[in-house]
């Protein structure tokens, strides 16, 4: 009886461990699931909804919480919706994607998903209208390199961006910009931005507006893989509460490229869930 019990216990342990191992996805598998789920907004294919966990937390303030909110969005997207993922990377349980949308009009967006095992359990995003034209340096919000490289430098590049935000963006030490950014090879994709300048240094477009207020107040997440690092922050833009998603490409421990999406955070009485933007 003891031997039989031991065999049964070992068998159950094997099944349990096997199920746990089966639930773990590789970074490539997570990326594939996110790409497929995003594409379902265009195709209205409901099968990718199986990737979503029952505890799914939604931070898009215009979408209802839980799996039901995503299902409704897939079933009834704005007419003519298209989704093309331009850049995507995985960082632990997170996958971050930069997307070219037609979603009630041409838009650019970042989507961030958190996995628990093989299920997607949380989502953040930021969406912005496409620029009417390329910026003063001739760049769009999406062009530029897309390949993830320098995988061995992931941690160092994330730390670089943390220090940059601590020192320069939040700390206001503008004299330290040169420590973090290429002086003559920084490609800027912000609608009003110019190469070799940050928003703090730009004086054209909306940045030239009298009384213009542009301020970061808090960094919520720093995600990265290889040469790409995404910083998710909040602050004020044109004196309005704003979510900032800034994507940087790092080369030789310097910022060499920047893409961003800015979205005004609506008043809480307009939210369709109570989870907050971050």
Identify the role of each PLM range.
Residues 1, 9-11, 182, 196:
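N-terminal leader/targeting signatures
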């Amino acid at each position: 009886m003891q031997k039989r019990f031991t065999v049964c216990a070992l068998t159950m342990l094997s099944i349990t461990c096997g199920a746990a191992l089966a639930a773990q996805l590789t970074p490539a598998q997570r990326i594939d699931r996110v790409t497929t789920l995003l594409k379902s907004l265009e195709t209205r294919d409901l099968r990718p909804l199986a990737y979503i966990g029952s505890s799914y937390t939604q931070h898009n303030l215009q979408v209802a919480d839980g799996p039901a909110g995503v299902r409704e969005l897939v079933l009834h997207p704005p007419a003519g919706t298209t989704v093309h993922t331009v850049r995507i990377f995985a960082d632990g349980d997170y996958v971050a994607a930069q997307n070219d949308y037609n979603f009630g009009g041409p838009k650019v967006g970042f989507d961030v998903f958190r996995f628990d095992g093989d299920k997607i359990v949380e989502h953040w995003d930021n969406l912005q209208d496409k620029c009417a034209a390329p910026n003063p340096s001739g760049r769009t919000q999406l062009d530029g390199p897309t390949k993830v490289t320098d995988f061995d430098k992931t941690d160092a590049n994330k730390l670089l961006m943390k220090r940059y935000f601590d020192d320069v963006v939040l700390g206001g030490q503008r004299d330290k910009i040169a420590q973090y950014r290429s002086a003559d090879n920084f490609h800027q994709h912000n609608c009003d931005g110019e190469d070799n300048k940050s928003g703090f240094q730009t004086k054209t477009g909306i940045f030239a507006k009298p009384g213009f207020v542009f301020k970061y107040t808090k960094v919520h997440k720093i995600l990265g893989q290889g040469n790409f690092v995404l910083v998710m922050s909040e602050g004020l833009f044109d004196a309005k509460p704003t979510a900032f998603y800034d994507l940087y490409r790092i080369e030789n421990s310097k910022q060499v490229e920047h893409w961003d999406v800015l979205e005004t955070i609506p008043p809480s009485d307009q939210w369709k869930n109570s989870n907050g933007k971050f």
